[in-house]
């Protein structure tokens, strides 16, 4: 018996089982996958190839009497299996139809009438215990009645009476008997009350579970598998119609940018064009260049992102605005000479206009050839612990230490999905948890498992033929049922078009002052007024510099060169900060430490970074020039760095480096010394192309802020993502010397504006006034018409979140400056000082914004606790940030109850509490009501 109806993790919270586990649980030389969608097809094909099994591609879709009726109807969960590639394309279209607005109702559906339109290129399985009235009697050649453990004898009787063939199937929801607990946690215990087998059955088990099953049903599994022959199609490159060659486009770009193609430029351009041509990537560059050229006429486009800034072709065609020769960037970091897959060109657009780019591509290439990329979300270690804890009724506070202590690894690490397993087996906190709750071990099976699917935030697919020839497309969302990795395997052209709020803010600023994008590009990168913004610590609104880590590094370096921006943004990351590389760079950059010579080539490559390896490109150059590594080895090394696989993986290249260095005339001792320098920072090295590209965005913000501080602040406030961010930003710009008025009855516009040298708050900042009402008020003001009574009342009150942005400082600044004088022995912190990394004991003031009482015994399906079960969550805010503070069930009677009984929203509390590593939350020890 072959298993032709198999569910995997790609049935998303309806079945458990990684594809490789599912395939290994199936006997025979062929396997059929029938998830509720086609997300897993590409990975399924790859894993079948590894296992030496034939893949049968299918899908399970519910069929109702009339899917156009938006009512709950009896349904048949029928399976459709592709006989050939035409059948596979038809399956993709069936999935698309089932997700249409007309058919979708709680879940994807097809109508009974659709079955008559299914071609002979598809096998149909009846489903388990179907509505027999919805089995089309005319489809006897390729519609099979399922016999499985959940079927009744009526299935066999119906097939015999009506002349249908039968097929033996499992009705699996997990691969092995031992996976039942993981499945229960995944879908919820109430879903698994049936007694029949839910795992994959072999023939013997099937005969035992279906004693009335027939030999014909078993034999038909082999006949069906033999009749199926599908190869997943791969896409051809999109053909871009143009009368120019890529070289001609580059030469035109050089003239437009005023570049004389001297030896450096001409040799580099020739090399890049030859590489691109040899891989037949020209059309890809034309597609991207055309899209960006169109976008630049309508919005602000980022200067570059990722490795594409290392390409001179990208610069000359206008794809990027970063000169790779001027900034010392590598083409090989962008196009891997040893691989034929398309390079990634990521582009930033204004976040409020990004969708226009998708619309342009749809119009140019046709709606059937453009789709949003899909994405699959997977269970991370900490979320798995939470899910399992709920299912096993483990009190959440008993899992806090375990979650805080879980081993953390980067996504590219080969044991990235084994963090829980390794925590349980190697760390004391894990062993204690397993000892107390043995069933929690199931969490290790769920880590990395598919959780849900969605639409990729940036990815767009463009194909030369309809996208539906390669994968299903959700009719409602326009998202393809395929993720980034699988799309690359099918050679689908993928464009990463990201929305960036900073670009929206910059364009808003330019619009206010009459500048254009070219004015920004014309600003010299040695503009001292821009650097002065950072040196004066005026970080508010400056891209990348709003985080504490970057600000800390910037405060220690007097920025005097554009190169400083790239270095700071590359060094203010956990790896360099923890390894000591950042502090060493600061010492050398500020003259506190000499730069000792190491090797002429090494010294030349690291001159710009004071003898410290900061960038991946530096590692690649050192390994190429000194270690004589091949490009294949260098690109393997680059991928190891890019995926942050750590020092052990990085050091695997040392032996070959040492041998190559010796051949190059470098003694083993010196080669080892050079490698030690590379080793110290190489595993944490950053992509220089990306660092330089994003430094331009930071630089543009500094330019805008130095020349137009009020307009830049107004734009930043207009596009703040929420009230909290707006208040924090306003506090900072006021500290930097700007003046503001929260609201002016006669001057306020819809949103923040600049008038009379001040920031004026908008009408929508007033509680109770939205965009529509604000526009009506402005129209009445313009026409000198009276306001409505309600409008007049709201304006008279003038209550905005910005009326008292320094309330905490005003009320308690004297206490914070001298806590000892007020009998407070601890330093009083600001809430923004409490982070996931900066944890421990804190004392701080906070205004109650929200409060929520929770009863542990009211959670459905959980074990009841005896005694105290109530806890209190408080949302507190000061002048810097917000944080959630928890009073647990043991402290609730003493601390929580008085707040609930006598306190109110708006009270100021002085809190003493603790936070734990990895969690930005305070557990309250004591408090004092200051009102």
Residue ranges and their predicted role:
Residues 180-247:
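Active-site or pore-adjacent capping/gating segments
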Residues 16, 39-53, 69-72, 180-184, ...:
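Glycine-rich loop at the start of a catalytic domain that most often binds anionic cofactors/ligands
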Residues 38-103:
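Hydrophobic or amphipathic alpha-helical targeting/insertion segments
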Residues 2, 30-33, 194-196, 242-931:
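Noncatalytic, beta-rich nucleic-acid-contacting surfaces in large DNA/RNA-processing enzymes
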Residues 5, 35, 55, 84, ...:
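Divalent metal-coordination and catalytic microenvironments
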Residues 35-41, 63, 149-154, 173-176, ...:
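Acidic, metal-coordinating catalytic cores used for nucleic-acid/nucleotide bond scission
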Residues 71-73, 116-118, 452-454:
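Solvent-exposed alpha-helices and their adjacent loops that cap or buttress functional pockets
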Residues 2-25, 29-33, 37-51, 93-177, ...:
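Domain-core and long-helix interface of multi-subunit machines
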């Amino acid at each position: 018996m072959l298993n032709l109806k198999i569910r995997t993790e790609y049935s998303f919270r309806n079945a458990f089982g990684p594809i490789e586990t599912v395939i290994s649980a199936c006997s025979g030389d062929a396997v059929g996958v029938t998830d509720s969608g086609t997300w897993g097809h590409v990975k399924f094909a790859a894993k079948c190839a590894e296992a030496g099994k034939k893949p049968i591609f299918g899908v399970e879709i519910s069929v109702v009497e009339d899917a156009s009726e938006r009512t709950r109807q009896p349904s048949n969960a029928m399976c459709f299996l592709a006989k050939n590639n035409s059948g596979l394309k038809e399956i993709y279209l069936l999935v698309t139809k089932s997700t249409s607005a007309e058919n979708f109702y709680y879940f994807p559906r097809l109508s009974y009438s659709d079955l008559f339109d299914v071609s002979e290129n598809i096998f149909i399985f009846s489903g388990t215990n179907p509505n027999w009235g919805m089995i089309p009697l005319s489809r006897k050649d390729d519609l099979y009645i399922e016999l499985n453990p959940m079927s009744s004898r009526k299935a066999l009787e119906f097939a015999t009476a009506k002349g249908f063939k039968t097929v033996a199937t499992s009705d699996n929801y997990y691969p092995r008997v031992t996976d039942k607990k993981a499945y229960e946690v995944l879908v919820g215990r109430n879903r698994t009350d049936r007694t029949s087998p839910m795992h994959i059955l072999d023939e013997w088990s099937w005969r035992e579970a279906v004693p009335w099953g027939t030999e014909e049903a078993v034999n038909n599994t082999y006949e069906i598998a033999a009749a199926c022959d599908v190869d997943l199609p791969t896409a051809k490159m999109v053909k871009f119609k143009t009368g120019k060659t890529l070289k001609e486009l580059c030469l035109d770009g050089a003239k437009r940018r005023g570049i004389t193609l001297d030896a450096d430029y001409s040799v580099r351009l020739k090399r890049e064009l030859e590489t691109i041509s040899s891989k037949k990537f020209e059309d890809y560059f034309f597609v991207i260049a055309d899209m960006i050229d169109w976008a630049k006429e309508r919005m602000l486009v980022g200067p570059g992102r990722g490795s594409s800034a290392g390409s001179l072709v990208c610069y000359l065609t206008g794809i990027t605005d970063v000169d790779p020769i001027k900034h010392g960037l590598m083409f090989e970091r962008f196009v891997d000479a040893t691989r034929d897959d398309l390079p990634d060109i990521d582009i930033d657009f204004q976040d409020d206009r990004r969708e226009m780019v998708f619309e342009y591509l749809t119009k140019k290439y046709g709606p059937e050839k453009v789709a949003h990329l899909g994405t699959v979300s997977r269970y991370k270690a900490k979320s798995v612990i939470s899910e399992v804890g709920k299912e096993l009724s483990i009190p959440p506070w008993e899992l806090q230490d375990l979650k805080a202590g879980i081993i953390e690894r980067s996504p590219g690490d080969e044991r990235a999905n084994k963090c829980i397993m390794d925590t349980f087996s190697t760390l004391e906190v894990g062993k204690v948890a397993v000892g107390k709750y043995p069933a929690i071990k199931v969490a290790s099976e769920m880590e990395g498992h598919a959780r849900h699917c969605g639409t990729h935030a940036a990815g767009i697919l463009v194909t030369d033929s309809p996208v539906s020839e390669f994968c299903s497309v959700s009719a409602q969302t326009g998202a393809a049922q395929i993720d980034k990795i699988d799309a690359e395997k099918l050679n689908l052209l993928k464009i990463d078009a990201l929305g960036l709020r900073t670009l929206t803010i910059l364009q808003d600023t330019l619009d206010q002052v009459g500048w254009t994008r070219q004015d920004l590009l014309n600003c010299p990168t040695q503009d001292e007024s821009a650097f002065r913004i950072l040196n004066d610590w005026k970080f508010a609104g400056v891209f990348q510099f709003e985080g504490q880590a970057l600000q800390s590094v910037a405060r220690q370096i007097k920025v005097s060169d554009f190169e400083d921006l790239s270095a700071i943004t590359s060094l203010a990351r956990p790896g360099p900060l923890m390894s000591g590389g950042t502090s060493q760079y600061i010492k050398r950059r500020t003259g506190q430490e000499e730069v000792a010579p190491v090797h002429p080539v090494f010294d030349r490559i690291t001159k710009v970074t004071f003898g410290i390896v900061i960038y991946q490109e530096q590692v690649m150059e050192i390994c190429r020039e000194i270690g004589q590594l091949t490009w294949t080895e260098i690109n393997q090394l680059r991928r190891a760095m890019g995926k942050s696989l750590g020092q052990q993986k990085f050091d695997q290249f040392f032996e070959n480096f040492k041998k190559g260095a010796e051949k190059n005339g470098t003694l083993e001792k010196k080669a080892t010394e050079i490698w030690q320098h590379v080793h110290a920072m190489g595993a944490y090295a950053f992509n220089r192309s990306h660092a330089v590209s994003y430094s331009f965005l930071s630089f543009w913000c500094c330019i805008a802020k130095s020349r137009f501080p009020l307009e830049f602040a107004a734009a930043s406030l207009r596009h703040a993502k929420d009230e909290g961010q707006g208040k924090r930003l306003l506090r900072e710009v006021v500290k930097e010397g700007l003046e503001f008025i929260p609201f002016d009855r006669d001057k306020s516009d819809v949103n923040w504006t600049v008038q009379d040298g001040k920031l004026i708050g908008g009408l929508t900042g007033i509680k109770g006034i939205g965009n529509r009402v604000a526009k009506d008020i402005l129209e009445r003001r313009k026409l000198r018409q009276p306001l409505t009574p309600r409008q007049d009342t709201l304006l008279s009150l003038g209550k905005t979140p910005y009326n008292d942005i320094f309330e905490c400082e005003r009320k308690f600044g004297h206490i914070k400056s001298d806590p000892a004088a007020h009998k407070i022995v601890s330093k009083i912190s600001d809430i923004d000082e409490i982070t996931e990394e900066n944890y421990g004991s804190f004392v701080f003031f906070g205004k109650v914004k929200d409060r929520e009482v929770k009863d542990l015994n009211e959670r459905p399906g959980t074990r009841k606790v005896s005694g105290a079960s109530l806890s209190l969550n408080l949302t507190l805010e000061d002048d810097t940030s917000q944080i959630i503070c928890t009073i647990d069930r043991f402290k609730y009677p003493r601390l929580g109850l008085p707040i609930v009984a006598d306190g109110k929203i708006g009270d100021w509390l002085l809190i003493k509490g603790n936070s734990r590593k990895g969690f930005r939350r305070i557990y309250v020890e004591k408090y004092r009501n200051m009102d």
